[in-house]
Amino acid sequence: MASSSNVNGNLVDELEEAFQSCIHALTKEESATGVDKDEIKLEVDQTTLKFIDLARQMEAFFLQKRFLLSALKPDLLLKEENFDLKQEIARKDELIRKHYEKIESWKNLLSDQQNYNKPIQSLPPDMRGNLTGGVPGGPGMMPGGIGMPMQNSMQVQQMQAQQQQMQMLQAQQMQQQMQSMPIG
């Protein structure tokens, strides 16, 4: 009687030959061989069925070996399951960590957005004083000679433009993050 490794070796060789003949039948051209389409189709079907049959035999062989191994050494199966569970836990921990990072970045974006949307009254008192004309050096005149109402309106316009730019930048960042987030 042949040993199991010899049978397995023969089975592997037969599977490889069946695969090669299947590929050969699929790539054969009818004009070059003088064989019509029906004969080629029949050959493809036969070689494919043989390949599938040998693949099932190979699968059955490995299942038998796995069953023998589980019966003779159950501790190996437990070690394998333990290893698989550890890998699964590590993968899920990494996924959770990535979600927490995204949540933190979203929190930061939202808090930044809320800070930029605060009205001018929330500015520090020294900046509010500049906007209302409370600058030392003369009523209504800046040291550079620009009138206070004009200077105030320029500062307000600059601040509004900066706020709009920041809001647009944040909106773009949020869109990019939403596009990079996996669905599901």
From Swiss-Prot:
One Pfam family recorded for the sequence: Med28
Keyword Protease set for record: no
Location (main, coarse): nucleus
Entry keywords, A to Z: Activator, Coiled coil, Nucleus, Transcription, Transcription regulation
Cellular component, GO annotation: mediator complex
Source domain of life: Eukaryota
Compartments, as annotated in UniProt: Nucleus
Keyword Transcription (UniProt): yes
Residue ranges of coiled coil: 77-105
Subunit structure: Component of the Mediator complex.
Family per record: Belongs to the Mediator complex subunit 28 family.
Functional description taken from the UniProt entry: Component of the Mediator complex, a coactivator involved in the regulated transcription of nearly all RNA polymerase II-dependent genes. Mediator functions as a bridge to convey information from gene-specific regulatory proteins to the basal RNA polymerase II transcription machinery. Mediator is recruited to promoters by direct interactions with regulatory proteins and serves as a scaffold for the assembly of a functional preinitiation complex with RNA polymerase II and the general transcription factors.
Name used for this protein in its record: Mediator of RNA polymerase II transcription subunit 28
Taxonomy of the source species: Eukaryota, Metazoa, Ecdysozoa, Arthropoda, Hexapoda
